[in-house]
Amino acid sequence: MAIREILTVPDPILKEVSQPVDQVDDDLRELMDDMLQTMYAADGIGLAAIQVGVPKRVIVMDLAGSDEEAKPRYFVNPVLSDPSDTLKPYEEGCLSVPTVYDEIERPDRIHIQYLDYDGNECEEIAEGMFAVCIQHEMDHLEGVLFIDYLSRLKRQRAVQKVKKVEKSKDRDAA
């Protein structure tokens, strides 16, 4: 397993639409293992493959709290359907938009179909934080970031803030 670099805005790769996975094999499982290790190292709760530069329809997630045992989840070729009419606001952040948080409204319940780590077909209803997180990560697979839901001014400020943070990190590393 390896920790991979997480791409940040305004990297154009983040705007690419991810492609379906043909099969769940050892190479894909290695990618998912790397993604999970990368997500944990960055203190995230979800990560899409495109965020590590791989345009495949793969998501890893772990919504366990810091005082709970890890509960990793894997979603290959996920498909969302039947969103609830009820929208709820949640404050979202993103490993690809570090230090930026804002409130986004999303359906609080949604149906999801996917392949798991072993390639088994699964389906379930996502609610609450799980629903928010899976929709956020699914947006990544379509080349959409949570800041795309914000006003143009807020989006520009977010990108500038990330550039400043990244520049500061580069200076500190030198």
Curated annotation (Swiss-Prot):
InterPro entries for this protein: Peptide_deformylase, Peptide_deformylase_sf
Species of origin: Maricaulis maris (strain MCS10)
Reactions this protein catalyses: N-terminal N-formyl-L-methionyl-[peptide] + H2O = N-terminal L-methionyl-[peptide] + formate
Gene Ontology terms, MF aspect: metal ion binding; peptide deformylase activity
Needed cofactors: Fe(2+)
Superkingdom in the source lineage: Bacteria
Keyword hit for Ribosomal protein: no
Physiological role: Removes the formyl group from the N-terminal Met of newly synthesized proteins. Requires at least a dipeptide for an efficient rate of reaction. N-terminal L-methionine is a prerequisite for activity but the enzyme has broad specificity at other positions.
Family from the record: Belongs to the polypeptide deformylase family.
Entry's EC annotation: 3.5.1.88
Top-level enzyme category: hydrolase
Signal sequence coordinates: none
Keyword set, alphabetical order: Hydrolase, Iron, Metal-binding, Protein biosynthesis
One GO term (biological process): co-translational protein modification
Chain positions recorded as Fe cation binding sites: C94, H136, H140
Gene this chain is encoded by: def
Cofactor descriptive note: Binds 1 Fe(2+) ion.
Protein known as: Peptide deformylase
